[in-house]
């Protein structure tokens, strides 16, 4: 059975002081921490491309797992909507070359935003099991610094750059359980890029998260024959502190189980869930975790991860 064996990440050291940004827009520390949730927003270097972030994360994964060899990688999937240059060729091909992976590797991108990790782990699991592959890499990297207007108070205080790499293979540390997905393209205008600049209708996105995610998680638990008490933690997309707090309250069941950890990262799009899993789940005593990603599309996905 294919599942999650290990997760590693790359978070740029350089970045933006969000308190300073907030002061520019007359927002105080209480607002920055309480509503936004991030005091610091990592930023890639100007000469770093999306593929470079991917390479850093994968190299960290190799360093943490010396038994995993480059020549053993069968498939590489990159989840991004802000790939290298103008998006052609696909970023996964560039990452394959920069990493020196074998040319026998299957490599492709998945164009999804904040729901991308949940979709991605099931997509790569299905691809690997259908084709009999042994070792896969699911990489997330969506540097919004490429598209966010630093003068837009609705977006510039939210997003951080980061990348993650997940080793998918047999004899996993975490198995993939039930999952549920959804899409509502009528909400596409609420999160979009026009002429290279990102736009977000924050109120609509907040309402979407509040209405959709708690109910979706309850449906997932019901489909899995699980109770809230069976879940050790809920690792949901870190859209903002306000969103995580509101979803936890609306869920109405052990809100303290909802992990909120974005003070030093910001909203890292498809990397936010795996960053939580790497930091809080991998070396924990947890037995079962619920994850959920939601955003651009509008798109959402929720799933159960469990120890074998």
Q: Language-model features: where?
A:
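Conserved beta-ketoacyl condensing-enzyme motif
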Residues: 4, 50-108, 226-244
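Flexible, glycine-rich active-site loops centered on histidine and acidic residues
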Residues: 129-160
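Glycine/charged-rich beta-loop-alpha catalytic/anionic-binding loops adjacent to active sites
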Residues: 38, 75-78, 97-111, 147-149, ...
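Claisen-condensing/thiolase-fold acyl-transfer catalytic domains that form or cleave C-C bonds
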Residues: 51, 55, 83-84, 89, ...
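Acidic, glycine-rich active-site loops and adjacent beta-strand->loop/helix elements
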Residues: 1, 9-10, 79-84, 112-115, ...
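Short, well-ordered amphipathic alpha-helical segments that serve as non-catalytic structural scaffolds
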Residues: 28, 50-65, 209-224, 276-277
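Condensing-enzyme catalytic core mediating Claisen C-C bond formation in acyl metabolism
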Residues: 1-46, 150-211, 215, 219, ...
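Buried hydrophobic positions in well-ordered alpha/beta secondary-structure cores of metabolic enzymes
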Residues: 4-6, 32, 61, 76, ...
């Amino acid at each position: 059975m294919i599942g999650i064996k290990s997760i590693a990440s790359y978070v740029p050291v350089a970045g933006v002081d969000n308190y300073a940004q907030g002061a520019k827009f007359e927002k105080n520390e209480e607002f920055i921490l309480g509503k936004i949730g991030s005091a610091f927003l990592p930023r890639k270097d100007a000469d770093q491309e999306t593929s470079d972030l991917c390479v850093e994360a994968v190299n960290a994964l190799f360093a943490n797992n010396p038994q995993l060899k480059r020549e053993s990688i069968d498939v590489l999937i990159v989840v991004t909507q802000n790939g290298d240059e103008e998006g052609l060729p696909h970023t996964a091909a560039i990452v394959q070359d920069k990493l020196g992976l074998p040319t026998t590797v299957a490599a492709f991108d998945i164009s999804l935003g904040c729901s991308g990790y949940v979709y991605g782990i099931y997509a790569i699991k299905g691809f690997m099991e259908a084709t009999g592959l042994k070792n896969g890499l699911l990489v997330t990297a969506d540097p919004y610094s490429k598209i966010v207007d630093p003068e837009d108070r609705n977006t510039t205080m939210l997003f951080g750059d980061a990348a993650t790499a997940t080793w998918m293979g047999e004899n996993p540390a975490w198995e993939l359980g039930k999952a549920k997905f959804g899409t509502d393209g009528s909400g596409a205008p609420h999160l979009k890029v026009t002429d290279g600049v990102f736009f977000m209708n924050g109120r609509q996105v907040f309402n979407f998260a509040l209405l959709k995610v708690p109910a979706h998680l309850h449906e997932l638990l019901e489909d899995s024959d699980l109770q809230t008490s069976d879940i050790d933690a809920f690792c949901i997309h870190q859209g903002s502190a306000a969103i995580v707090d509101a979803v936890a309250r609306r869920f109405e069941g052990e809100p303290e189980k909802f992990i909120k950890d974005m003070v030093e990262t910001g909203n890292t799009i498809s990397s936010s869930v795996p960053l939580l899993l790497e930091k809080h789940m991998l070396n924990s005593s947890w037995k079962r975790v619920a994850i959920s990603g939601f955003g651009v599309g509008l798109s959402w996905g929720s799933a159960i991860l469990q120890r074998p």
